[in-house]
Amino acid sequence: MLNTLPTDLCANTPSITIRDNRGFAIIALTYNRTNTHQAPEQLINRNHYNALSLLAASRDPRLEVDNFRYQYSLSGVPLRTDSVDGGSTLQLADSAGRTVLTRDAHHSRRWVEYETGEHSLGRPLSYREQANGGLKTVTDRFFYGENSEQDKGCNLNGTCVRHYDSAGLQALISQSIIGIPLQQQRRLLTDTKGPVDWFGEKENWGTRLSESPFVSHSTTNALGQLITQTDAKGHIQRMAYNRAGQLIGSWLTVKNGVEQPIVYSLTYSAAGQKLREESGNGVITEYRYEPQTQRLIAIKTTRPAKKDRPTLLQDLRYDYDPVGNILAIHNDAEATRFYRNQKIVPETTYRYDALYQLIEATGREADTNGIQNSQLPTLASLNDSNQFVNYTRHYHYDRAGNLLKIQHTGASQYSTHITVSDSSNHGIQQQDGITARDIRSQFDAAGNQRQLQPGQPLRWNSRNQLQQVEPVPRNDGISDSENYLYDGSGSRVVKISLHKTHNAIQTRSVIYLAGLELRSQYNGNNLTEDFQVMTVGAAGRAQVRVLHWESGQPADIVNDQLRYSFDNHLGSALIELDSDGDIISQEEYYPFGGTAVLASRNTVEAKYKTIRYSGKERDATGLYYYGYRYYIPWLGRWLSADPAGTIDGLNLYRMVRNNPVRWSDSNGLLTEEQISMYVNMLSYIGLKNDDELKSELLNYGLSEEEQDQIYLNMPMFTQSGSSSSSATSLSENSSSSGSTRSIDSGYISPIKNYHFFEDINLATMHRPYPIEKVSSEEIMYAAAELKENSHIEVLIGLDLTSKNLQSYKSALADEGIDYITKGKYEIEDFFNEGGLSTEQIDITVNKILKLQESAIVGVHCGAGNGRSGIIASALAINKLYATNEVSSFNVTHPLGGTMPGNKDTYQVDIVTASAVGIIRKTNPQAVERNEDVSALYDYSYLLYTRQHSTSL
């Protein structure tokens, strides 16, 4: 559902890119304002490129110095990066391009040792690290499957089978033929406090590891999807899928128990979006989407009828502006209330500036709420949860996107001020006596915050991972603290909390394993509680956690309690239900993550809720753990600099571009939308692995540094949970799809995504040559395959050329196909921001019309849908104007895009929609983007004006 958009706010606030004579974007201009009475403020981002055409420096609109500076070797390999937020890093590579030495801002060094020898594969053998002024230690050792009968029987040849890392030993016992782990073993360090050192012979390392390993087992189907997963304590999860590979059911068997359903059924739309989900407790969740944009517009959750309880649990409705910002969320399951002379409507509303940063939010909160800080608000009983008041929040930012002030009006009136450095984006909550110049001392050289609150020190390890927080430091004894241990991939595997009481030290520990958390509590040396939390990760939208006590079970909770958590569009846990569908807890959130409403049926059960905002775990410190970083919800910023660099912008502390209502972050690197965008781009341009992506990104003008930040740091390009050393490229795991014929990894069939449109006598297809250099035999085969299957006589290349172009052109000529690949027919895609101009479209269409007088013509682009779809649609537009045959191809839904501003847009719209209908009739994936449609509108209007009085 669309709501009213203040279009005047965005008037005269364009985004402008200025390029140098080499085509590089050197200046990006944006304009912003928060209300229509303000004049737009100009914001200037600058890039500088060196003589090698490599990005040398970037600067944001706020600072007078460069945010980032880059230095390269003579061959263009990145050597050094200087960041005002994250400090200086140095990396050196060997002659094969492999990183052999890195040095971070602390001057901590890491050396990588690789296999050597004539027949070696060049795999990493060890990591050696040395903190500044410390001793050199071996932090990681890698051992690979040999050519033994046992390794061959378990599909382990050449695979990393034992990884000694910073948490202990991770061993792979067996894997499927397509590389999916089937049996794994984890042994943790017995001493989690001291530095790890795997120096010497591995026979001597066993004493440093726990005696009892944690072993997990899995079974998979032919697609590599999990069918069963048996965790380290013997609990079994089972999953089922439909023919499309979508989850349709899941079950859980607690050890020595009876299998019970977690998800009864799931149904999906044709677009793959979830429509209906029935949980094991009988609760049904239904989803609705806006037809044109496929945006989520409603989530409705109901439970089975039962005496003295309502069946409707939540009924969320979403209002959007035309670009996708959420303007309001209504919960029709809640009643409007009146309290303290206020009308309390169960809805939240949002307002944005011209850059789509959130500047105002309204909603409801508990009347007992005070100033938001690291503590949760007062817990209310479910029976007393009706005492709400309205709140309004205003958010203020600087020119670089730093959140400076949160102004709150509601149960309490207060403002949270954030002091930001005048030389970086470092920032902390305002303190007496701390000025912008003093902020530098509050962060270490790598951009890690030194204190959570005044007097609460933070300690970081040599890999810039948070190692310890001391909420209550003591000089004369053991401090209250929370300590963390990470494995070689950077994932947290152990959390230990120490709390001093009058009589003893209370210790709480959590061990994180696949699908399982092992939690325990000690008072001194006495074990007071020991329980396991099974996390059902494939349970649809309703995430389920099962609590199983071995000892110390609380009186108010049944053993093996199922807790179904129902969330919103961000994944934030709103309602917890038990196996009978009764409410355990309810929670509502402010934007940026604070808790506005918190209620539970009893205080004991409330203590065991750990997953909250955005589906992430909230620690006792008040921080949220995202994976790569920790998040400060009461300040709306990250605790440390983004380890992925500028992948989410020059400000390394900004949270989801200051639009936390629309976007979420899955792992502390970048927004979910960006991850989806890159994955879709990979698929859209017809690439199947990260090597091809890197080559293609070069065509889009991205520097090698930017390419590395995209394809090396993103989790979808490595196996989940694997270390950086044993991460597997998609090129090693992915099989080809469609009509791709695997001569070798570089070959792409020229008839992939081939379509012939009889109405316009034109063929479109995927790029008919590989990106990487391949053999002449493969090029000849591809040319023959195209000739045999398409019968085209002329082929026009619409995308940029590659190193195979001339060889392929000659091969096509031998097959009698003329390949036109130069001049104005090489058209830049909309990924390059410029897009297809009306002139380019007009020239190309006229060329095709001329060629069609004597030949069968085809066109190609990266994937055969974008540029090819535009040119095919434009050719259809041209022929519709020439023949006046419109109505038979008319489509009944709007296309999107931007119409030209003139009085004849109705006629132009009919012709454009009819033409796109012709193309989509054969290729439904063509012309999917609004930018493509806008280009076609402009071309259609050009033809309309030429005909002047054309009658439609």
Go through each PLM region and give its residues:
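Low-complexity, glycine/serine/proline-rich disordered segments
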Residues: N667-D744, S949-L952
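Short turn/helix-capping motifs enriched in Asx and small/polar residues
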Residues: G581-A599, K607, G622-L623, Y628-R629, ...
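A motif-centric feature for acidic-aromatic and gly/ser/thr-rich catalytic loops and repeats
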Residues: P554-G627
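Acidic/glycine-rich beta-solenoid
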Residues: N35, L63-F68, Y72, P78, ...
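Hydrophobic, small-residue-rich alpha-helical packing segments that form membrane-like cores
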Residues: A39, I44, H48-L52, E64-S75, ...
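Carboxylate/His-rich catalytic cores and anion/metal-binding grooves
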Residues: I27, H37-P40, I44-R59, L172-Q183, ...
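Cysteine-based protein phosphatase catalytic domain of the PTP/DSP
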Residues: S745-N753, F757-I856, S873, I877-Y937, ...
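Thioester-forming pentapeptide GCGEQ
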Residues: M1-N45, N50-A51, P213-V215, A222-Q225
